[in-house]
Amino acid sequence: MTASEIDIRKILKLLPHRYPILLVDRVLEFEPQKRIKTLKNVTINEPYFMGHFPDQPVMPGVMILEALAQSAGLLTFGADMERKEGALYYFVGIDGARFKRVVYPGDQLHLNVTVERYIRGIWKFKASATVDGEVACEAELMCTVKQAEG
């Protein structure tokens, strides 16, 4: 499966997120079980800009981390190109998160996620978000896939 084959319809099949929480617009590069590069077009229409901050809109760091986690989810589910019925992808940890550049409306956020390892059901990823080649955020993410409860 190539990056061009993972269009928005496939993203919507692989991720359970929907507006306003879906934070991946496109897959740019994809190596199954190795790495993924995705794109988030940051627009003033994002609902969080109404309060963060009205006179100086800035993308919240937690939303950048969420976009990275969703990219990691695509990397995990993308290997099989399907999300098992009832399976959800859970964040279980973040290490070393650093925010190095402010992200504004109009920016294109490039999300880079690489598999570091997979042990006992826990995926560990190295992740970074860049704007115009400049690092905005970097972190190590830990995630797991589990059946939804209830």
Swiss-Prot record:
It catalyses: a (3R)-hydroxyacyl-[ACP] = a (2E)-enoyl-[ACP] + H2O. GO terms for molecular function: (3R)-hydroxyacyl-[acyl-carrier-protein] dehydratase activity. InterPro entries: FabA_FabZ, FabZ, HotDog_dom_sf. Its EC number is 4.2.1.59. Keywords: Cytoplasm, Lipid A biosynthesis, Lipid biosynthesis, Lipid metabolism, Lyase. The active site is at residue 52. It comes from the Bacteria. GO terms for biological process: fatty acid biosynthetic process; lipid A biosynthetic process. It is found in: Cytoplasm. One of its GO terms (cellular component) is membrane. Its main location: cytoplasm. The keyword Zinc-finger does not apply. HAMAP family: FabZ (MF_00406). Involved in unsaturated fatty acids biosynthesis. Catalyzes the dehydration of short chain beta-hydroxyacyl-ACPs and long chain saturated and unsaturated beta-hydroxyacyl-ACPs. Belongs to the thioester dehydratase family. FabZ subfamily. This is 3-hydroxyacyl-[acyl-carrier-protein] dehydratase FabZ. It comes from Cupriavidus metallidurans (strain ATCC 43123 / DSM 2839 / NBRC 102507 / CH34) (Ralstonia metallidurans).
